[in-house]
């Protein structure tokens, strides 16, 4: 019986407890079983998984140039660093942009609804792969590419491939102004 342990855990605002032994579930308890929690930037790990599945399924390549992946979304003037950027660079935080964009406090301030075009229009100051900058642009664009190639949002794409296998039921995902899953954050599990 774990009731005393649960009562003690409640005083620390523990959200859930799972007890396993030799790989078998012995007991579990959740403070709010149907409540979803925002996992914020840990969302990026799930977007990376989506990219991995898409690569495995032949929907995209890590070496694909962004100029080939997003031909309709490119700025009028394409600098040399953007021409070199690949899907792989989207996942490494070394995209080549000088500062982080699409960050939480910035998103409500954007006048532009098309964040793909906005993201690609931000100058690529550095050669991709040479400067680390924590940035939501890479994971966001990676998620967009998976959605475009798979024909569905990230929840629909990841549910049969990952979420069902992990026992994650009914995840939700924040979207950009055009309704695309925001691959850099806002996944609720």
Regions found by a protein language model. Name each.
Residues 23, 38-63, 90, 142-146:
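Active-site SXXK
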Residues 35, 39, 78-80, 127-134, ...:
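Solvent-exposed loop and edge beta-strand segments that line ligand/cofactor-binding
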Residues 10-11, 81-85, 110-112, 125:
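Extracellular/periplasmic catalytic domains that process cell-envelope and extracellular macromolecules
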Residues 57-97, 121, 150-185:
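Active-site helix/loop module of the DD-peptidase/beta-lactamase fold
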Residues 94, 102-110, 115-139, 143-175:
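Active-site cradle of extracellular carbohydrate-active enzymes
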Residues 2-33:
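A short, well-structured edge-of-sheet supersecondary motif
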Residues 42-48, 84, 134-139, 187:
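Short alpha-helical patches at coil-to-helix transitions and adjacent helical residues
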Residues 25-35, 120-128:
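Glycine/charged-rich beta-loop-alpha catalytic/anionic-binding loops adjacent to active sites
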């Amino acid at each position: 019986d774990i009731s005393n342990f649960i009562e003690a855990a409640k005083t620390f605002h523990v959200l859930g407890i799972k007890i396993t032994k030799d790989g078998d579930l012995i007991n579990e308890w959740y403070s709010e079983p149907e409540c979803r929690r925002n996992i914020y930037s840990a969302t990026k790990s799930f977007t990376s998984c989506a990219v991995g599945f898409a690569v495995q399924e032949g929907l995209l390549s890590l070496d694909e140039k962004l100029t080939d992946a997003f031909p309709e979304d490119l700025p009028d003037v394409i600098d040399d660093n953007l021409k070199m950027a690949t899907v792989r660079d989207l996942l490494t935080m070394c995209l080549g942009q000088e500062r982080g964009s699409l960050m939480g406090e910035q998103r409500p301030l954007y006048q532009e609804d098309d964040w793909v075009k906005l993201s690609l229009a931000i100058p690529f100051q550095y050669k991709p792969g040479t400067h680390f900058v924590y940035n939501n642009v890479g994971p966001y664009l990676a998620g967009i590419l998976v959605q475009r190639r798979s024909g569905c949002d990230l929840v629909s794409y990841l549910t049969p491939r990952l979420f069902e296998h992990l026992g994650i039921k009914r995840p939700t995902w924040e979207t950009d102004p055009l309704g695309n899953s925001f691959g850099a954050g806002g996944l609720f599990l």
